[in-house]
């Protein structure tokens, strides 16, 4: 389990044994000070092609997925691997030590090592004071290559941390926590586990706080069969306002199935739709009852 932080740490490993008595089924085998989520997402502040998000808490939820996508457009620069590895290790922490307060220093040092400028706003009258300057962000190959190299460092750090335990226990693997939503890393781990030990890798999809609550309940109830929580989220909270929204925005409401052809034609014309139906997903999803299609 590795993510942006929890009550018991940032990077934890457990050995599960459901045959043992309940109080002995879970054994802690890894307690690491390694924090890979925050240094990974923090680089998003400096990438021009990613919409700027000022709030740190919101940025933690927004930047990571977009950075993973951007990594595919860049190339790993071998000479940047060591400086970025050093940058990641500066975020190592114990408990809630707010190392992110030192991020400007981390970025300045990284910039000197790799020859890039990470510009901050030091105007104390600006809302961006002490944050990345929104008008001076990285573009082009420098931006894409930085994120591609960061993705490699991220993968190497996590894989090297958990590989000894995979090799020792030779069993199925469960990945959880926000960082476990990085499908590039998940694929690397799954390929290794499957090829070397012919075991399976399960990635918990509900890595947000809803998963924590569910885990506590399931640990207490111990259901005999796995519950289907795919769409166990909230209903559309403002669905009663739909017609009012249409009137406010002067939008047309389609209620005849034959008019869906209009939607199809618009999609073929590269227009984008937001799809909202039923209850929401239990945890973050790229597609489902809350989707952007185009």
Label the predicted regions.
Residues 1-91, 96, 181-182, 186-294:
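Flexible beta->alpha loop and helix N-cap segments adjacent to enzyme active/binding sites
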Residues 2-5, 116-126, 176-179:
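Phosphate-binding glycine-rich loops and adjacent basic patches that engage nucleotide phosphates
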Residues 29-33, 136, 140, 144, ...:
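Hydrophobic alpha-helical scaffolding
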Residues 58-171, 184-192, 196, 225:
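A contiguous, well-structured pocket-lining segment that forms one wall/lid of small-molecule binding clefts
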Residues 169-178, 274:
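Short glycine-rich phosphate-binding loop at a beta-alpha junction
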């Amino acid at each position: 389990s590795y993510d942006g932080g929890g009550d018991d740490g940032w990077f934890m490993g457990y050995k599960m044994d459901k045959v043992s008595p309940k109080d002995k089924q879970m054994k802690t085998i890894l307690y690491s000070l390694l924090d890979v989520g925050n240094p990974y997402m923090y680089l998003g502040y400096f990438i021009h092609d990613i919409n700027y998000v000022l709030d740190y808490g919101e940025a933690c939820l927004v930047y990571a997925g977009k950075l993973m996508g951007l990594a595919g457009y860049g190339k790993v620069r071998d000479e940047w691997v060591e400086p970025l590895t050093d940058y990641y290790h500066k975020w190592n922490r114990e408990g809630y030590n707010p190392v992110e307060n030192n991020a400007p220093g981390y970025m300045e040092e990284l910039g000197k090592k790799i020859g890039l400028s990470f510009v901050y706003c030091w105007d104390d009258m600006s809302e961006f004071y002490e944050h990345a300057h929104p008008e001076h962000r990285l573009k082009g190959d420098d931006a894409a290559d930085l994120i591609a190299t960061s993705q490699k460092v991220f993968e190497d750090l996590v894989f090297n941390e958990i590989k000894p335990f995979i090799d020792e226990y030779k069993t199925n693997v469960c990945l959880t926590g926000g960082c476990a939503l990085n499908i590039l890393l998940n694929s690397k781990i799954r390929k290794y586990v499957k090829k070397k030990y012919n075991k399976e890798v399960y990635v918990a999809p509900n890595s947000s706080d809803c998963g924590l609550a569910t885990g506590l309940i399931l640990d207490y109830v111990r259901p005999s069969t796995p519950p289907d929580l795919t769409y166990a989220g909230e209903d559309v909270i403002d669905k009663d306002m739909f017609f009012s929204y249409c009137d406010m925005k002067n939008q047309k409401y389609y209620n005849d199935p034959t008019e869906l052809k209009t939607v199809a034609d618009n999609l073929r014309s590269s227009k984008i739709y937001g799809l909202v139906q039923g209850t929401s997903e239990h945890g973050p999803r790229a597609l489902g009852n809350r989707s952007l299609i185009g």
